[in-house]
Amino acid sequence: MQSTDNDLSQSPPKLSADEQLKAASDQLRGTILRSLADPLTGAVSDSDAKLLKFHGIYQQDDREQRDERRRQKLEPAYQFMIRVRLPGGVCSAAQWLKLDELARAYGGDSLRLTTRQTFQFHWVLKHNLQATLQGLHEVLLDTIAACGDDARGVMCTADPRLSALHAAVYDIARQASDHAIPRMRAYHEIWWGEQRVASSDAGPEEPFYGQTYLPRKFKIGFVIPPVNDIDVYAQDLGFIAIAGDDGALQGFNVAIGGGMGRTDQAPATYPRLADVIGFVPPEAVIATCDAVMGVQRDYGNRKDRARARFKYTIDEHGLDAVKAEIERRLGFALQPARPFRFDSNGDALGWQTGEDGRHHVTLFIQNGRLVNLPGLPLLEGLREIARVHTGSFRITPNQNVVIADIGDAERPRIEALLRQYQLEAGPSTSALRLNSMACVALPTCGLAMAESERYLPELVGKIEALLRTHGLEREPITIRMSGCPNGCSRPYIAEIGLTGRAPGKYNLYLGGGFHGQRLNRMVLENAAEAAILALLDTTLAHYARDRHEGEHFGDFAVRAGYVEAVTAGRDFNQRRAPGAGATAPHA
């Protein structure tokens, strides 16, 4: 990336402790090598744990063992989560087989598909970190900037049916990912064993990021209407593909300022949907990334991490001022945004045939967890498919997987393996379950306040019973759960959203847009399951009785008065008492 002449970052002594740590880290090297070599603990130092995030690694521990290990005077059961950088969620069969091999060797026989179209390994011990990352390197994968205060993994619509258009957009998304990540010589030295090169010989280590990188994480995504599978309005920087009448790519509408994270009882924090500010041709995408990220680098809040995301930078300085600064850095004005429409943010499950005649099958992976379960050997089945598949795999933003680019001759073999391992969702799987999504949460995530991945399938089963009672079992309703308010599953744009507050207690949100175009609003705070189901029973019964033709549940919740529509992120935390016969807002 090109540096700018307008770096407004303050000197590190005036900034937060995290900013000072980055500045003093020797470009993210810290003492990571020393921590890795320490045989007396399964952890790394506190400062190195923060720096490891830039390397795509989170230090965690098994929270279910904490009390027992404390009684035994043992340190926590430390382990690490590793997140792969996978632009647009595309990987080859050879890469899938290597990921499977590493998961079995070091990751507890489990792979986790994420809401940003990549893989996570959990349960990796410290002494296995280098072997895991070196194994990824063997198939040209890495974990650079998968976490940390930088440009995170770049997303791209996973629908392969639009073959030529998808290929054009994906190619630009991949270029943006390669361009936006830090240069990270530290990564090459620590994990791949490369020798350090003197800065005077190779130029500045980080010509764009400098010593303090970005104030917080920065998320970029590319979407191809009419499917908003990446939830483009939740991205810091979103590119909405615009195709001409001939289906060829004309360029992108640019959306800025989305983000989900918030903190309970902190009204100054809130989710925000991105604003569309204009249009750029394909050749201006990389420059637009530089300009937008440069504004956040130079104007983002480096004193208060809770207010450091780009969405707050926009709200503090004003959208018009931020757009003007982006255009100043670009050296040209954005063109007016062009018309587009979205109609869903879900996946087209099952078999599809693309424009080029190639076949693709999208498999439902509940909450993205690939393990071998009794009667459902997901990990095993997909490994066997990867052994014979000549095309690619694509991870969707809904934590599902597409087996893509299947030829006519190959299809019968793939179909046979799908039947053998029972990998396709049956007709009895409800539309609600197919549109459900949860973050990992307990027992590994250190931020989780309540269950998510392990609990949502059970809760969905109870809501399914309500849907059957009211004749709504085939109605597509989006439901998302996060174990804390940070919102990794993007719950604040779901028609039914839940975020953990304490063990067994959740905030319940209603009224999100079916294709991610509207934030929802809280209707129950710190509520137990019984109160959640009671309120949903009331609203679903009302929906079944009084909905309009084609009206989605989230739209109905707003129209019927259960929630007032959120028109701006800063309005999200203003409580609105539910109406239309709903229960009280606290339970």
Curated annotation (Swiss-Prot):
Pathway: Sulfur metabolism; hydrogen sulfide biosynthesis; hydrogen sulfide from sulfite (NADPH route): step 1/1
Catalytic activity: hydrogen sulfide + 3 NADP(+) + 3 H2O = sulfite + 3 NADPH + 4 H(+)
Chain positions covered by the region annotation Disordered: 1-20
Record GO cellular component, one term: sulfite reductase complex (NADPH)
UniProt keywords, alphabetically: 4Fe-4S, Amino-acid biosynthesis, Cysteine biosynthesis, Heme, Iron, Iron-sulfur, Metal-binding, NADP, Oxidoreductase
GO molecular function: 4 iron, 4 sulfur cluster binding; heme binding; metal ion binding; NADP binding; sulfite reductase (ferredoxin) activity; sulfite reductase (NADPH) activity
UniProt: [4Fe-4S] cluster binding residues: C439, C445, C484, C488
InterPro entries found in the cross-reference section: CysI, NiRdtase/SiRdtase_haem-b_fer, Nit/Sulf_reduc_fer-like_dom_sf, NO2/SO3_Rdtase_4Fe4S_dom, NO2/SO3_Rdtase_4Fe4S_prot, NO2/SO3_Rdtase_4Fe4S_sf, NO2/SO3_Rdtase_FeS/sirohaem_BS
Recorded family membership: Belongs to the nitrite and sulfite reductase 4Fe-4S domain family.
Name under which the protein is recorded: Sulfite reductase [NADPH] hemoprotein beta-component
The species this protein was found in: Bordetella petrii (strain ATCC BAA-461 / DSM 12804 / CCUG 43448)
Lineage of source species: Bacteria, Pseudomonadati, Pseudomonadota, Betaproteobacteria, Burkholderiales
